Amino acid sequence: MRTLSSVLLLLATAVVAAPTHGATLRDLSLTLPDGRAIAYGLSLPDGGETTPRPLVLALHPGGERMPRYGSWFARNIVMQAIAPLNAIVVAPDCPAQRWSDADADAMVMQLLQKVMAEHNVDRRRVLVVGFSMGGGGAWSFSSQHPDLFTGAIPMAAMVGSEPVEKLATMPTYVIHSRADSVVPFGPAETNARKLEQLGRPIRFEALDDLPHFSMGGYVPSLQRAVQWVTERWKQ
């Protein structure tokens, strides 16, 4: 497994010339009623919230973690790709071993309830985006909470134990590289094709020559994914 420093180096070389998102992301923390705390980044849209805004939940990958990993992932990968949405962005640090853990699910849902109560969120446009472990979280959250999320973009991720009837019930854009040696390409493609055959609103984009840790190389595909989901929302 690569160290975090090597991952950051790979990412930096890939995104150094990429445009940045105009909004500011603040590092915050929420203490829950049971005393546990969850760190998160929050970005509010340019121009205020006089009209309802989309909300994007950004889920960072696993591996060696650093404080405020959620904010780092949002700033360097997600925000530049979703800039056209002018969305509210919520980027938590995973409070458990995996995003699909019950504790992580419960804590993130409480965080989203707070954000949605305090800000003008368009409930018809709530997107979850994640990479690797975070992509698994995108599959998990979208299948467990179809009443909340209306779009999902899992990148370089595998599906967990979610039953197939719960997957891709909303616009879902899957991105995976054939050169991924950490999360195999084959099962991801097979799963997406099965869901296509079931008539689910899913799109699968295959990338070439991108190692698993080259997150920055996924940004152009993420931009296309956001555009595709946005078009589905308009239908």
Region spans (language model):
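A domain-start/cap signature at the N-terminus of enzymes
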Residues: 15-55, 103-104, 129-131, 136, ...
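Active-site machinery of serine-nucleophile hydrolases
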Residues: 55, 59-116
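Short alpha-helix in the alpha/beta-hydrolase fold that links the catalytic acid
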Residues: 70-72, 184-194
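Short, proline-enriched alpha-helix->beta-strand connector loops that line the catalytic pocket
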Residues: 85, 167-172, 198-200
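Primarily recognizes the serine-hydrolase "nucleophile elbow" in alpha/beta-hydrolase
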Residues: 116-118, 124-169
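Short beta-strand/loop motif that positions the catalytic acidic residue
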Residues: 173-176, 180
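Histidine-bearing beta->alpha loop at or near hydrolase active sites
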Residues: 177, 207-214
